[in-house]
């Protein structure tokens, strides 16, 4: 199947999709925003006391661009599924585009993005993941879970190397090409065609609820100088 057919097959599964920049698209079109960021990155690197090889600077910029939506505005697709006609038009105009899966309530998905072996180890120590849709990424895995129903913002945890993509977010899905050259792939036996997203387990629910709770609503620790309560 080509990317249009694959995107339509995801849509048929009830998933909101959109086109995302691919390496070949960037090379062919050289979008202005990408070229500007690349020029800035090269200038900053050139002024550094420990500059990176130019190819590494270009590679990093390409990786970032290949995670960016082609659409200038995609907020409405966080609220509704695109039509078959819309998806067909997008991927007819951009046949080599990567495929973005919009997460959140619209697709009934929350994705745990594990970016390292450390992140995978943490997840295993918490009880691991149930049998669910899983994709291989360059550094780790995307675990596709059923959305729990409450609002979940996207989050980045640099300490654990676990990112959450939920309401207002998206992930790049197989068989898209990463800016570094590898392709996203479904884990054998755990593709979107073979499984439905599993419900979040206890540790995942606690993790998501902690993200969803505003800091001001979390219980603050008692001050040491606080007077004792009389009974």
Which residues fall in each region the model found?
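Conserved phosphate/metal-binding and DNA-contacting active-site motifs used
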Residues: 1-225
């Amino acid at each position: 199947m080509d990317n249009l057919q694959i995107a339509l097959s995801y849509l048929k599964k009830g998933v909101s999709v959109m086109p995302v920049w691919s390496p070949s698209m960037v090379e062919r079109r050289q979008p202005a925003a990408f070229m500007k960021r690349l020029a800035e990155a090269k200038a900053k690197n050139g002024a550094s006391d420990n500059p990176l090889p130019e190819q590494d600077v270009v590679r990093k910029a390409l990786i970032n661009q290949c995670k960016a939506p082609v659409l200038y505005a995609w907020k409405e697709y966080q609220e509704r599924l695109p039509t078959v006609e819309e998806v067909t038009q997008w991927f007819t105009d951009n046949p080599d585009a990567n495929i973005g899966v919009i997460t959140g309530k619209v697709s009934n998905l929350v994705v745990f993005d594990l970016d390292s072996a450390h992140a995978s180890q943490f997840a295993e120590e918490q009880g691991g993941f149930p049998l669910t849709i899983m994709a291989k990424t360059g550094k780790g895995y995307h675990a596709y879970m059923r959305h729990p129903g409450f609002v979940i913002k996207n989050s980045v945890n640099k300490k654990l190397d676990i990112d959450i993509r939920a309401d207002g977010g998206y992930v790049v899905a197989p068989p898209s090409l990463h800016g570094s050259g590898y392709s996203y792939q479904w884990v054998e036996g755990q593709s979107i065609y073979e499984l439905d997203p599993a419900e979040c387990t206890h540790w995942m629910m606690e993790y998501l609820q902690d993200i969803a709770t505003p800091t001001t609503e979390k219980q603050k620790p008692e001050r040491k100088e606080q007077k004792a309560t009389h009974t």
